[in-house]
C-alpha cells in the first residue's frame, strides 16, 4: 500500500505515501515490484498492497549479540556497544573499522537477493550520531562517516524498486537502559529530557531534508521517530506529549519549506499503543500522515504456552490491530532462550514447524499493512534470526504468496 487511507474518513483526505496506491516506485530497469498480482485465490488482499521486508539489523547500529564475528574483526571484542568500541579504539582507528563494516555487511548483492526472494521493503536502523555535529565531542563516542554508506544502501534499494523505512534506532541519551541497539550501554535511559528531544528533532529535520533533496533517498517513504522507547507510560509521558507532536511539526515544517506537496510527505512512524509507552496519538493534532510500528516477538509473550501447537494457534489468531495503519516492523522465529536448543525446538530438525509458524505469522501480519522481519542476516548459525539463512534452509519460501497454500491455521 502506497498511500494510506485516512484514519478518520469524516475528515479531509491528506495522504502520506506508501508504495502501490497513489505513488508508484520503479526499479532502475523500470520494474514495479509492488504491482504483482497474487496467484493465490486465498489472499484477502493482493500481494502488491502489503509490505514484505527485512531489517538491516547491525548495519548502522551494531548489536554484538547477532554480529559477533564482524564485531571481533573490527577489534571490538569485549565491548558492549558502538560507544564503548569507539572509546576503546580511538576515533581514527574506529572510523576505519566501522567504514570497513559498512562497506561489507550489506552490499548491493544483498539488496538484489532480497528482491529475488520476493521482498519489497527494507527498514534501516540508524543512530542520531549520523548527524555528526549532534555528538558531544567531549563526552560521546560514535563512529563518523556513516551517511555516505546510508546513501549507497538507499540508492541500491531505490534502483531495485524497494520501499525504504529509516528508523531512529539510537536516540540521544539512549531511550532504553543497557541496550546496545541504542548505540550505547547506558545504565539509565537519558532520552526523556527536553534537551535530548531537541537533538533528536534536529536529526529528524536533517534526515527529512536529506531524503527529499538526495535522489538516492527517493524511495524512502517513512521515518520512524524513535525505536522501542521505555515500556512505562509514566516515564514516557513527556515523549508522548512533547516529543511526538514536536516531531510532526518539525518534519512537516521542513517539508513545507522545501516545497514538498502533501502527496510526497513522509509517513511519520511511532511505536503503537501495544508497545506499552502510552497512546502515541494522545497529543497529536494532525495524524493523517502517521504510521505505527508493532514489534511482535512471541518468545517474550508469557501468555503463550511454550509448545508448538500453542505457538501456531497464537499466531493464527494474533490481531495486531489498534492504531492504524500498522506495520509489524520487527518479528522473528526465535523461541524462549531456555528451550531454543532442545530437541523439540532445535532448528535443523524442526524445519516443518518453523515453516508453518513463519506462514502463520506472516499471514496474521498481512492483515495489517505487512511486516519487516528481524533481520536480513545474523552471525548466529541460527536461521530463526536470519531471513536469508531461513530461505537457504527451506523454511521461508522464495515465493511468498505460497505461504497461503500452507494453510497453517
Curated annotation (Swiss-Prot):
* This protein's UniProt keywords: Carbohydrate metabolism, Cell wall biogenesis/degradation, Glycoprotein, Glycosidase, Hydrolase, Polysaccharide degradation, Secreted, Signal
| Catalyzed chemical reaction(s) | Random hydrolysis of (1->6)-linkages in (1->6)-beta-D-glucans
EC number per UniProt: 3.2.1.75
Output the Gene Ontology cellular-component terms.
extracellular region
Where found in the cell?
Secreted
- In which broad location class does this protein mainly occur, judging by the first location in its UniProt entry? secreted
Q: Which residues form a coiled coil?
A: none
Q: Where is the signal peptide?
A: 1-16
Q: Which family does it belong to?
A: Belongs to the glycosyl hydrolase 5 (cellulase A) family.
**Role played:** Beta-glucanases participate in the metabolism of beta-glucan, the main structural component of the cell wall. Acts on lutean, pustulan and 1,6-oligo-beta-D-glucosides.
Q: Which PANTHER family match?
A: GLUCAN ENDO-1,6-BETA-GLUCOSIDASE B (PTHR31297:SF39)
Q: What is this protein called?
A: Glucan endo-1,6-beta-glucosidase B
Source organism per UniProt: Emericella nidulans (strain FGSC A4 / ATCC 38163 / CBS 112.46 / NRRL 194 / M139) (Aspergillus nidulans)
Kindly list the organism's lineage: Eukaryota, Fungi, Dikarya, Ascomycota, Pezizomycotina
Amino acid at each position: 500500500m502506497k498511500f494510506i487511507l485516512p484514519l478518520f474518513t469524516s475528515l479531509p483526505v491528506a495522504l502520506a505515501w506508501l508504495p502501490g496506491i497513489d505513488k508508484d516506485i520503479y526499479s532502475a530497469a523500470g520494474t514495479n515490484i509492488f504491482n504483482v498480482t497474487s496467484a493465490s485465490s486465498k489472499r484477502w488482499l493482493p500481494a502488491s498492497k502489503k509490505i514484505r521486508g527485512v531489517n538491516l539489523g547491525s548495519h548502522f547500529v551494531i548489536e554484538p549479540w547477532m554480529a559477533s564475528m564482524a564485531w571481533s574483526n573490527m577489534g571490538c571484542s569485549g565491548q558492549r556497544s558502538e560507544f564503548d568500541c569507539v572509546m576503546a579504539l580511538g576515533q581514527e582507528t574506529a572510523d576505519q573499522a566501522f567504514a570497513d563494516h559498512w562497506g561489507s555487511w550489506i552490499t548491493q548483492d544483498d539488496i538484489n537477493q532480497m528482491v529475488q526472494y520476493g521482498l519489497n521493503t527494507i527498514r534501516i536502523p540508524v543512530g542520531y550520531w549520523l548527524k555528526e555535529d549532534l555528538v558531544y565531542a567531549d563526552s560521546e563516542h560514535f563512529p563518523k562517516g556513516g551517511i555516505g554508506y546510508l546513501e549507497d544502501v538507499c540508492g541500491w534499494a531505490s534502483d531495485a524498486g524497494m520501499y525504504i523505512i529509516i528508523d531512529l534506532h539510537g536516540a540521544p541519551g539512549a531511550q532504553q537502559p543497557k541496550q546496545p541497539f541504542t548505540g550505547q550501554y547506558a545504565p539509565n535511559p537519558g532520552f526523556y529530557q527536553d534537551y535530548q528531544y531537541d537533538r533528536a528533532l534536529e536529526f529528524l529535520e536533517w534526515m527529512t531534508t536529506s531524503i527529499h533533496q538526495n535522489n538516492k533517498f527517493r524511495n524512502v517513504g517513512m521515518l520512524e521517530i524513535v525505536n522501542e522507547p521505555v515500556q512505562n507510560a509514566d516515564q514516557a509521558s513527556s515523549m508522548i506529549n512533547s516529543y511526538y507532536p514536536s516531531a510532526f511539526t518539525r518534519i512537516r515544517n521542513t517539508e513545507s519549506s522545501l516545497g514538498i506537496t502533501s502527496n510526497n510527505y513522509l509517513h511519520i512512524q511511532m511505536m503503537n499503543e501495544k508497545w506499552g509507552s502510552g497512546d502515541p496519538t494522545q497529543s497529536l493534532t494532525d495524524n493523517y500522515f502517521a504510521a505505527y510500528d508493532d514489534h511482535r516477538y512471541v518468545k517474550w509473550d508469557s501468555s503463550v504456552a511454550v509448545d508448538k501447537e500453542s505457538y501456531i494457534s497464537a499466531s493464527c489468531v494474533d490481531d495486531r490491530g489498534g492504531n492504524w495503519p500498522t506495520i509489524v516492523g520487527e518479528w522473528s522465529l526465535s523461541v524462549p532462550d531456555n528451550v531454543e536448543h532442545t530437541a523439540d525446538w532445535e532448528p535443523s530438525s524442526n524445519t516443518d514447524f518453523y515453516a508453518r509458524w513463519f506462514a502463520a505469522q506472516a499471514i496474521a501480519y498481512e492483515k495489517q499493512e505487512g511486516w519487516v522481519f528481524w533481520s536480513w542476516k545474523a552471525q548466529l548459525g541460527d536461521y530463526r534470526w536470519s531471513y536469508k539463512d531461513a530461505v537457504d534452509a527451506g523454511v521461508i519460501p522464495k515465493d511468498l504468496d505460497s505461504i497461503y497454500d500452507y494453510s497453517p491455521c
